[in-house]
Curated annotation (Swiss-Prot):
Self-association state and partner proteins as the record states: Homodimer.
Cross-referenced Gene3D superfamilies: Leucine Dehydrogenase, chain A, domain 1, NAD(P)-binding Rossmann-like Domain
Name of the protein in question: Bifunctional protein FolD
UniProt entry keywords in alphabetical sequence: Amino-acid biosynthesis, Histidine biosynthesis, Hydrolase, Methionine biosynthesis, Multifunctional enzyme, NADP, One-carbon metabolism, Oxidoreductase, Purine biosynthesis
UniProt-listed CDD domains: NAD_bind_m-THF_DH_Cyclohyd
Pfam families: THF_DHG_CYH, THF_DHG_CYH_C
Any Gene Ontology CC annotation: cytosol
UniProt pathway: One-carbon metabolism; tetrahydrofolate interconversion
Protein family per UniProt: Belongs to the tetrahydrofolate dehydrogenase/cyclohydrolase family.
Biological process, per Gene Ontology: L-histidine biosynthetic process; methionine biosynthetic process; purine nucleotide biosynthetic process; tetrahydrofolate interconversion
GO terms assigned for molecular function: methenyltetrahydrofolate cyclohydrolase activity; methylenetetrahydrofolate dehydrogenase (NADP+) activity
Gene name for this UniProt entry: folD
Domain of life, source organism: Archaea
InterPro entries to which the protein is assigned, alphabetical: Aminoacid_DH-like_N_sf (IPR046346), NAD(P)-bd_dom_sf (IPR036291), THF_DH/CycHdrlase (IPR000672), THF_DH/CycHdrlase_cat_dom (IPR020630), THF_DH/CycHdrlase_NAD-bd_dom (IPR020631)
Length: 311
């Protein structure tokens, strides 16, 4: 694997035998840089605003939305917090989205998943104004991504790209294996890696739950991006020496002392062979939140026709 140990703008590695890619540090640097972009927009008379809509009783979702609001406050983005009873009819959520679409003071809309069973997630995503779709999941934005003309990149894959760039990991010509085929991570990640752009130009193999002999694919990889949502499915025996491992998974598993968070990669054994690896937590997760801010700032710049530089 071609791995460059050059100091980058967002310094994120520690000089040990295996490089630990610190997403918390990179995300903090991006948030710091976004403040100047937000200030430039505010000086034109507009404050960027993100509206979040929560329609579930999941404590983890509630905590995650709260963290997003804290991030917004840090960089100067205003927020609007909307909570809908999970038992309410789907029409109430649809009407809320329609109202936010029509509100010119709202620049980004995020509907927190999961949604109740009686609400069609696809219809909700289609209903959001594509220019306010800061998750990047509207069919129009998905199409633009596939065409190589993205308006908003989905936050987790975009965050992974930023990590690869920050760690000076060479993707051009690399064999990259993406494990997982979700619309949120796996599919857009594979698309971004093959594009003619920074953190692109890789040769990509997509694997999933029906892939035969997964280990044979991962052992041939220069870069592994594990996003299947299966606790510790990848261990050191499944990777070759010198591989870069990006662990997207965040799974709560029961232990003798209660529970703990683990990734899709068994960290200890993988770290012994990897050139670089992300921790869980503290790797990809903070980057996902940072790129939501990034997309919201970009959405505001588009809405106000303001020229800004994004980190």
């Amino acid at each position: 694997m071609r791995f460059k140990y050059v100091a980058s703008k967002y310094s994120c590695v520690t000089q040990t035998q295996t490089q630990l890619i610190d997403g918390t540090e990179v995300a903090a640097s991006i948030r710091s840089d976004l403040i100047s972009s937000v200030t430039r927009i505010v000086n034109t008379g507009t404050t960027p605003q993100l509206a979040t809509v929560l329609m579930n009783d999941d404590p983890a979702s509630q905590t995650y939305v709260s963290m997003k609001h804290d991030d917004c406050e840090e960089v100067g983005i205003a927020t609007r917090d909307i909570t809908i009873d999970p038992e309410a009819p789907a029409a109430e959520l649809f009407d809320t989205v329609d109202e936010l679409n029509a509100d010119s003071s709202v620049h980004g809309i995020l509907v927190q998943m999961p949604l109740p069973d009686h609400v069609d997630e696809r219809e909700v995503l289609r209903r959001i104004d594509p220019k306010k779709d800061v998750d990047g999941f509207h069919p129009e934005n998905v199409g633009r991504l596939v065409a190589g003309q993205p308006r908003y990149k989905p936050c987790t894959p975009h965050g992974i790209q930023k990590l690869l760039i920050a760690a000076d990991i060479e993707t051009e010509g690399a064999n990259a294996v993406v494990i997982g085929r979700s619309n949120i991570v796996g599919k857009p990640m594979a698309n971004l890696l093959i594009q003619k752009a920074d953190a692109g130009n890789a040769t990509v193999t997509t694997c999933h739950s029906r892939t035969n002999n997964l280990a044979s694919k991962t052992r041939d990889a220069d870069i592994i991006i594990a996003a299947a949502g299966v606790p510790e499915m990848i261990d050191g025996d499944m990777i070759s020496t010198g591989t870069v491992v990006i662990d997207v998974g965040i799974n709560r598993v029961e232990t003798e002392n209660g529970s703990e968070l683990v990734g899709d990669v068994e960290f200890e054994s993988a770290a012994k062979k990897a050139d670089a690896i992300t921790p869980v937590p503290g790797g990809v997760g903070p980057m996902t939140r940072a790129m939501l801010l990034w997309n919201t700032v970009k959405a505001t710049a588009i809405a106000t026709d303001t020229s800004i530089e994004l980190p």
